[in-house]
């Protein structure tokens, strides 16, 4: 998949929420410096993150923070924010427990904590 796009507002809010939860300082105006690279064919799903002038490549990463929410069909969705070995935003990873398509990203007020693996 070679498609890239701006980060959707719901994703921006979720990334900011997860970064804040981990006390990870995002650079000023970060949402305008990064591009989303969808990693799934679904409208809502995991995205790779890369700066405007870089190419998204697979590399070593680690989970910075995580949360969960319930989709409109009441199925749980886990969300993980990953950073690379340079402490740069790398992926926003979604996993719906029944592997069905994610329908909606709710506001961050709806997010719940989950134990980090």
Language-model regions, residue ranges each:
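Short, compact, well-ordered microdomains
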Residues: 71-116
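N-terminal domain-onset segments
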Residues: 1-66, 104-117
